[in-house]
Amino acid sequence: MNSRPLLLIGAIALSACTSDKAPSSEAVPAPVEPSTPATAQASPWEQAKARGLVFRGIGNEPGWLVEVGAGETPALHAELDYGERKIDVAHALPLTGATGYSGTTGDGVEVKLQLLREECSDGMSDQAYPVSAKLGVGDQTYAGCGRFLQE
């Protein structure tokens, strides 16, 4: 008996069971989540705290915000009139006999931030804050609310 036909049939059958593609030794990678900084999803209050600020305040009509850095003579940054005007005090001084800061901008404008620990509502969102804030910039006064961030 000739075994060649049997070997030929076995080889054909075996080749039918294999794929044209060689098996991949690489695993299919898991989907990659978009890389976004944690602060992109955080609230403005959490972002300010993460930047090391000690106070953040906001107000309406016109819209404004103020942020105060850490230290004995912290930087004070404010965005006024819905962000149309920005001011910076490089080294604000603590108020004597009150909670707050005062200083002068680089172009000579007097700035005073007075803070009072009392419940405050911004009037627009009905969000309650633990601090009322009054920001004086030159002869203009802005009223609003805020919170100390590092307590």
Question: What residues fall within each predicted segment?
Answer:
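Post-signal peptide N-terminal segment of mature Sec-exported envelope proteins
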Residues: S25-K49
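Short, exposed beta-strand-loop hairpins at the edges of beta-sheets
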Residues: S121-D126, S132-Y142
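Acidic, glycine-rich flexible loop segments
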Residues: G108-A128
